[in-house]
Amino acid sequence: MQEQYRPEEIESKVQLHWDEKRTFEVTEDESKEKYYCLSMLPYPSGRLHMGHVRNYTIGDVVARYQRMLGKNVLQPIGWDAFGLPAEGAAVKNNTAPAPWTYDNIAYMKNQLKTLGFGYDWSREIATCTPEYYRWEQKFFTELYKKGLVYKKTSAVNWCPNDQTVLANEQVIDGCCWRCDTKVERKEIPQWFIKITAYADELLRDLDKLDHWPDTVKTMQRNWIGRSEGVEITFDVKGYDNTLTVYTTRPDTFMGATYLAVAAGHPLAQKAAANNAELAAFIDECRNTKVAEAEMATMEKKGVDTGFKATHPLTGEEIPVWAANFVLMEYGTGAVMAVPGHDQRDYEFASKYGLTIKPVILAADGSEPDLSEQALTEKGVLFNSGEFDGLAFEAAFNAIADKLAEKGVGERKVNYRLRDWGVSRQRYWGAPIPMVTLEDGTVLPTPEDQLPVILPEDVVMDGITSPIKADPEWAKTTVNGMPALRETDTFDTFMESSWYYARYTCPQYQEGMLDSKAANYWLPVDIYIGGIEHAIMHLLYFRFFHKLMRDAGMVTSDEPAKKLLCQGMVLADAFYYVGENGERNWVSPVDAIVERDEKGRIVKAKDAAGHELVYTGMSKMSKSKNNGIDPQVMVERYGADTVRLFMMFASPADMTLEWQESGVEGANRFIKRVWKLVYEHTAKGPVAALNVDALSEDQKALRRDVHKTIAKVTDDVGRRQTFNTAIAAIMELMNKLAKAPQEGEQDRALLQEALQAVVRMLNPFTPHVCFTLWQELGGEGDIDNAPWPVADEQAMVENTTLVVVQVNGKVRGKITVAVDATEEQVRERAGQEHLVAKYLDGVTVCKVIYVPGKLLNLVVG
């Protein structure tokens, strides 16, 4: 064994061994308990960042630990390879998205291998290949035949710069999340999947997810947004149709003083024909933000349509306004307004001088003061005719019943969740497998024409999708008739909604999934990824699993038993102000810093001498130029050091602060383990451990070893507090380094301890542990070695600490045998000099003894 720890030599050698032996390739094995460990697949952006490294290190630690427990562990990896960034990069680099993507995959695959992740590379998937998306296309046509897919014209967020539709979540402050262009509203025909048909089950089954973070479950509950209420129909004078509204507060119905409709509502359109002010307002609303969070904060505006609706219970005429806070695609595109008891309605009514009628009493039973704001709490009704005096629940039921009796209302369950719009007007995505005949008939692409292959050899102009720009591409024939293919492509969330299932049978050619393999591996035992995916990806992921279950492909109801959301990686951020007042962000690697005695940064400059402003720790990002390249760190310290730091610096679900001093500390620790193994093995062969022959000191050390095994097993396995597991191993290493190594049993004990330490560290630092296991004469490869098991006998304490008091005051502590009698404890206490001086020349009148804990001597 060489004396110096040289990671660059060890790591490449061990990685080559794993590759040649195909160590992490697995197949179904009914005789073994399976464990499916999955990290969210990366987008091949070109380089791994520290967020990736953290995510995949956590996954690899879990997978390697479960493997050492003797389980059949599947840990696959792939590439979420479609998406808009590839189009931008292709235009910029004068290439096509496909070669750019495949080059990035090759580069990043190499980076993953350098970090020593134990993936089953035989199952690698790239979602942009026809071998993958063909099954998604086929499944979509089957969902269409089942009535779960439909096309409708819908208002979308349109980014005029990217020429594409944005999801509500991609609109930030009314602008495109990617290019910051002002977003417009546009009506276009789009394909939708009926996720609302599964809303109740998606909500209900959250209760089955005992090992998902509550924050994620709460976000999904709110996103699905189930509510119970009443749908009410209003007659409108001079308008051919009725208006329908939905309310969760029918108890306030007698206080409804106006209705509001969306600018795109047919009633508003009709009124605008001879109302120039309204027509201009409708035009302005075309650029209204559609994200709900934005809707809440924007200024509420409206125009009176001139139409009057009849209140179905009072018969009063109430005005109908067009308002910018009502959206056509939410509910019916019309709402009833109760300004006395809804703050938004109150602000709008106050602004435009509309009637505000209170119908709910304040908590103290008095009429509410509505001079400054609405009373939104539930309470007892007044000013409501026959319903006066009723509290919320009774009023809800009485008014709902009355409306139903009159044929103008019915109870309804509503959801905030909208159907999933899967059409994207971009090129680099899977083509949607639908065709339109010359007579306008829309059909799914026939199975013998699947997959609809996306041409990869294209020229990007950065504006129009190449498959939209080429009229020939869309032409096809169906049943002998000319037809045009759909030129929209799928939302990339489609690919990431089912990849986890395809990993179980990536080479399967007979269909989307091989049920036998899928049902052996699924559900995923642990899924690791960022909390930013809580409502989009993680909801579609659950939805797709239920679709596949209902198609008979899988038997489980949910895709993943446990979800671990890792925290973000933060780093120091610095900038200097340029000549034009702009901020120039400087990488923390290039910042020369001065610190105070507490280690806080007080001054910084860069190599060019610019005084730098330190903004503290923030998420690693391109915009602040504070990302640390994992590759540079691996080259400097080795993959094992980077991995160990990642797992030690912070609990997995908390933010991690990148500190190079911490990385150096992790590196020093690995060197200490190496040095101790080197010194130990250099002394030659080791005798067998004879537990019965150990001295008290040796037994105490062995007790520490086995207590550490027990703690680390619990921390890594049950609690998943990996940082405390590493801390416990470090503490044990300190004791082992100080332990005597002279006697035969000293060395035998150290051999047992080091073999345990190396196996416990193996999930974290697999390369160095692979090597040290061989040097310690471990059996076979460490990858197939069992996790160490704590010896219960070794952990039994044979001594205990007894506190000695004289007249109730603590005067000393003594170590005695666990089975010592009261006499022996008293005798031992008398020999303790700190205690003895208080007993000199006095009489002990009374002895209070709590066995194994406390001895109190009362003296006179």
Curated annotation (Swiss-Prot):
A motif ('HIGH' region) lies at residues 42-52. Keywords: Aminoacyl-tRNA synthetase, ATP-binding, Cytoplasm, Ligase, Nucleotide-binding, Protein biosynthesis. Disulfide bonds: none annotated. It catalyses: tRNA(Leu) + L-leucine + ATP = L-leucyl-tRNA(Leu) + AMP + diphosphate. It is found in: Cytoplasm. InterPro entries: aa-tRNA-synth_I_CS, aa-tRNA-synth_Ia, Leu-tRNA-ligase, Leu_tRNA-synth_edit, M/V/L/I-tRNA-synth_anticd-bd, Methionyl/Leucyl_tRNA_Synth, Rossmann-like_a/b/a_fold, tRNAsynth_Ia_anticodon-bd. The keyword Nucleotide-binding applies. GO terms for biological process: leucyl-tRNA aminoacylation. It comes from the Bacteria. This is Leucine--tRNA ligase. The lineage of its organism: Bacteria, Pseudomonadati, Pseudomonadota, Gammaproteobacteria, Enterobacterales.
